[in-house]
């Protein structure tokens, strides 16, 4: 990879925002992948550490070459990580949103990410005890801690990660939902949900049934 910050000084803020969120999604999915290894996890966690420090700096100032160089490194590390560990549900869904509605790939990933974290960790099932939550909770909690987030238990720490992602999207003017984009009608979107879910499930990286896929896209 050619990691030269001077080549991306003129990249507009909106494209920077989409790109850095794609980097973060790459690293996060590699971290929680069931195919992860010690080596891929080390690369992904370092990428997340760099993103946490330099994401907003790179977005706010294209001339901050140090921040852009660090985000280049984060991108490369995340790429090496997911090349080994693979990606997951977030990318499977984002590919379909991009193909159907021409949403930039990083932006589609960013809008989906809070919902995918909640789905993978199952933290919205209030009736469960701490021990019954999915193994992804521990991995997401680790990611949150790398970003400097913490709470009194792992479940609340994962919630802090969801809040962090949503905060970053707001700071970078990325819509939190399809409806906030204002370019896709509600009817058009809901008519496409079934076909997008079916297409996402055809990807080998998806381990979710059709009903769950439709629920997430709703």
Where are these regions (language model features)?
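A glycine/threonine-rich phosphate-anchoring loop and its flanking beta-alpha core
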Residues: 1-36, 135-142
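Residues on a specific face of well-ordered alpha-helices
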Residues: 18, 22, 26, 45-49, ...
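Glycine-rich phosphate/diphosphate-binding loops and the adjacent beta-loop-alpha structural elements
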Residues: 30-84, 95-98
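Short coil/turn segments at secondary-structure boundaries
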Residues: 66, 156, 179-182, 208-213
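Glycine-rich phosphate/pyrophosphate-binding beta-alpha loops
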Residues: 76-109, 202-205
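Gly/Pro-rich interdomain helix-loop hinge
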Residues: 103, 107-188
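Short, amphipathic C-terminal "tail helix"
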Residues: 187-218
């Amino acid at each position: 990879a050619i990691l030269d910050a001077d080549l991306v000084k003129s990249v507009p803020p909106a494209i920077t925002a989409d790109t850095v969120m794609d980097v973060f999604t790459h690293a996060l999915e590699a971290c929680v992948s069931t195919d992860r290894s010690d080596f891929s996890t080390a690369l992904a966690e370092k990428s997340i550490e760099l993103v946490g420090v330099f994401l907003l700096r790179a977005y706010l100032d294209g001339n901050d070459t140090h921040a852009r160089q660090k985000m280049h490194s984060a991108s490369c590390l995340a790429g090496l990580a997911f090349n080994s560990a693979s990606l997951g549900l977030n990318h499977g869904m984002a590919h379909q949103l991009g193909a159907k509605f021409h949403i930039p790939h990083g932006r589609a990933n960013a809008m989906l990410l809070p919902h995918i974290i909640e789905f993978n960790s199952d933290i919205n099932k209030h009736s469960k005890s701490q021990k019954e939550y999915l193994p992804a909770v521990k991995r997401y909690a680790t990611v949150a801690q790398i970003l400097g987030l913490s709470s009194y238990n792992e479940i609340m720490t994962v919630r802090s990660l969801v809040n962090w992602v949503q905060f970053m999207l707001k700071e970078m003017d990325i819509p939190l939902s399809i409806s906030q984009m204002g370019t896709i009608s509600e009817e058009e979107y809901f008519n496409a949900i079934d076909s997008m879910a079916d297409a996402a499930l055809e990807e080998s990286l998806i381990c979710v049934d059709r009903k769950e896929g439709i629920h997430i896209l709703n």
